[in-house]
């Protein structure tokens, strides 16, 4: 079945309604531990069961790295990013993984979320190996599959880059098709879409079959002022959590870094994780392992100057979908520990 171009609501900008809060509150009640057994060091993290975050979380739990650093990590399964956002706002979980641009936007709107690095991996823009599309300018009039919806950070970075360097508005000059990444991969392989903007882990199987990266997202980020080694994704939690769980930012960061150290060097650990990775071939397995390792950031906080430059570039391009109306980095976005 061929997908039709359509628009969906900006879920990042969508206000959290009373109904959504009630639903999340119900989830919180179901997930809450009994009062007597609920200790202050229990941290609930919302994650997709099959996402790349699950690999790191499983490593933390398998090796007891949470307990080693003084807390207990509890996994709360979620269906998607919007669900995680709502659960965090409602107190149904303590930690989610998202980008610091979203955190800055939420802080400008009165939230108290903070960010510590998780991964510097971002998406890929791919075309078929024999495609006539050679540059972003060739996407005019083409159908582009986009995973994550209109607020996907990689899609917005590409659009901002196209406006800045080529005066092209891909939102108007091309047809965007928003769908789940697995479905988009199928549509791409059936030639129902001309290009695909998808998450890094879904790009590797396509690359293995010859798909060509139209432009490197690291080059896009660099042009927009962001150091490509600056992680966009991170663990996000409220300052209130940091106050009630002493040193949690440091503890969580150390557990994450310890897990990444294992995943960076231990081949046996990846063999253990393979059932979680939903891969059918050794080639895909090796590609995903290499991709995760390539996304491991330095054990430092993002460069605030580079972050400001990126937000300014988004402002100049007119993109408010991701950053909101305020083009400055909100004070306190990056956790201090």
Tell me what each language-model feature is:
Residues 64, 92, 97, 107, ...:
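Sec/Tat-exported extracytoplasmic proteins
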Residues 68, 219-228, 294-304:
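Short, solvent-exposed loop/beta-turn-alpha elements that line the ligand-binding surface or hinge
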Residues 311-337:
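Conserved C-terminal helix/tail region of periplasmic/extracytoplasmic solute-binding proteins
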Residues 100-101, 182-274:
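Pocket-lining segment of extracytoplasmic ligand-binding domains
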Residues 243-318:
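Secondary-structure end/capping motifs
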Residues 14, 33-44:
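C-terminal segment of N-terminal export signals and the immediately downstream linker at the start
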Residues 39-169, 175-178, 187, 194-200, ...:
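Short, glycine-/small- and polar/acidic-enriched structural segments
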